[in-house]
């Protein structure tokens, strides 16, 4: 399934979200079950399946990590294996450990001001990586794009941990 084809969009990391939303609504309207009440059971099933594909494609195109993986797969034919592709960048591995330790300390100290600053730093890193990823994809540097995408996957998980700590601190 090529999510770009489903929405009739060019294969590009930068997706116009307004166009994507408009096309999503049009597709979902055309596939609405009410439009198939007089059709055969098979046609109804196919419409439901197509609707599910549209939903899956939307999720891929809205998530920059999944969108990048899809672009890489389209151009290289390679599917990314998350378990197999942990980053070998030692500096980034050390940074990951440092961030986790820093987050643990913030949680132990229950310091919401430090958490806000930490979160802002991580989000800034995420934005820089997204920019690097866009550049790598546009210049078709697939291996570099994979490495950056792995880093973004870690950042995404770390930001979820930050949210968990934030919720915990708010309960106090």
Swiss-Prot record:
Record-linked Pfam families: HSCB_C (PF07743)
GO (cellular component) term, any one: iron-sulfur cluster transfer complex
Record key words, sorted: Chaperone
GO molecular function ontology, one term from the record: ATPase activator activity
Keyword Transmembrane helix: no
InterPro entries reported in the protein's UniProt record: DnaJ_domain (IPR001623), HscB (IPR004640), HscB_C_sf (IPR036386), HscB_oligo_C (IPR009073), J_dom_sf (IPR036869)
Domain J residue range list: 2-74
Biological process, per Gene Ontology: [2Fe-2S] cluster assembly; protein complex oligomerization; protein folding
Family: Belongs to the HscB family.
Role of this protein: Co-chaperone involved in the maturation of iron-sulfur cluster-containing proteins. Seems to help targeting proteins to be folded toward HscA.
Description of how the protein assembles with itself and partners: Interacts with HscA and stimulates its ATPase activity.
Descriptive protein name: Co-chaperone protein HscB homolog
């Amino acid at each position: 399934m090529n999510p770009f084809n489903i929405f009739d969009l060019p294969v590009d990391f930068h997706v116009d979200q307004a166009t994507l939303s408009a096309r999503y609504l049009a597709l979902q309207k055309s596939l609405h079950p009410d439009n198939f009440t007089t059709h055969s059971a098979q046609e109804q099933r196919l419409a439901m399946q197509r609707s599910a594909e549209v939903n899956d494609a939307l999720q891929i195109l809205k998530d920059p990590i999944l969108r990048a993986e899809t672009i890489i797969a389209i151009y290289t034919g390679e599917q990314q294996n998350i378990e197999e592709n942990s980053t070998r960048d030692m500096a980034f591995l050390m940074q990951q450990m440092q961030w986790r330790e820093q987050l643990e300390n913030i949680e132990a100290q229950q310091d919401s001001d430090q958490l806000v600053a930490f979160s802002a730093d991580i989000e800034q890193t995420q934005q820089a990586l997204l920019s690097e990823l866009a550049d790598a994809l546009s210049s078709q540097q697939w291996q570099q794009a994979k490495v950056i995408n792995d880093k973004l996957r870690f950042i995404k998980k770390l930001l979820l941990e930050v949210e968990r700590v934030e919720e915990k601190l708010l309960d106090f």
